[in-house]
Amino acid sequence: MAFTDYETEQLRKALLKETRRCAVTLGMKKTSVDQLTKAVGIAKGSFYKFYESKEMLFFAVLEGIHAELYGVADHALSETDGLPPSERAAKAVLAVCRRLSDTGDMVFIENDAKLLLQRLPEGVKNVHYHDDETHIRQ
C-alpha cells in the first residue's frame, strides 16, 4: 500500500514517538521492529520505506533528543543574558539535566547510545559527526 505524503509524515512521527517511548521503557535491544510497526499500524515490510534499519530509527530518535537539548540550553542562555558567563553556563547545564530527568531520555542515552553508535555505518557517523558545530553556530 502506498502512503500519501501526509500519511508518510504522520507515520514517521508516530514511529519516532513510539521508538522514543520504547527506548526509555524497554531499551533498544528489547524493542523489535514488529513491536514498533504494530504500535503504529503498519506492516513490518512498510517499516523499511521509512528507515533502513532499527538502528537508523533509534539514531533518528537520538538526534531528535540531541536537537531538543541544544534548544533547551539555548533557551536557558537567552533568558540569562545579564548574568556572568559561568552562571549562564550553569543554568544551561541544569536546564538540560532537568529535561533529561523529566523525559527519562537519560536512560536511553546511558543504556543504549554507545551500542547504537557502534552499530551505525561509518558513513552515517561521519556525516553527523560535525553536527555539534552546526548547533553551536546557530
Where are these regions (language model features)?
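Helix-turn-helix
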Residues: 25-56, 60
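Hydrophobic alpha-helical connector segments
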Residues: 60, 74-103
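Basic, helix-initiating cap at the start of DNA-binding domains
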Residues: 1-26, 33-39
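Amphipathic alpha-helical segments used for helix-helix packing
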Residues: 88, 98-123
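Amphipathic alpha-helical packing segments from all-alpha helical-bundle domains
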Residues: 67-70, 74, 117-138
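Generic hydrophobic, amphipathic alpha-helix propensity
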Residues: 11-19, 36, 61-65, 69-73, ...
